[in-house]
Amino acid sequence: MYRVLLRPPAQKFLRKLRDKSLLARLMAAMRELAHQPRPPGCDKLAGPENLYRVRVGDYRVIYQVQDNALLVLVVKIGHRREVYR
């Protein structure tokens, strides 16, 4: 089982989130990453970093998998229009 850690931008997004049902869905998606870091439907993002994306409605969870440390590092969470900037 992998550990899931959140970087400060992801923590800040979750703290400011007012929609509790969305918060619950995001938390469930991140808990699932602990069991299966590359679930069906996740996409590897282009670029030099080893980043993946999982969709939760109109929101995206951007994360990095470190297999040697059994770690999933959530880099950013945001609306699909803003998360890639």
Locate the predicted segments by residue:
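Basic, Lys/Arg-enriched alpha-helical interface segments
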Residues: M1-R53, Q66-L73, E82-R85
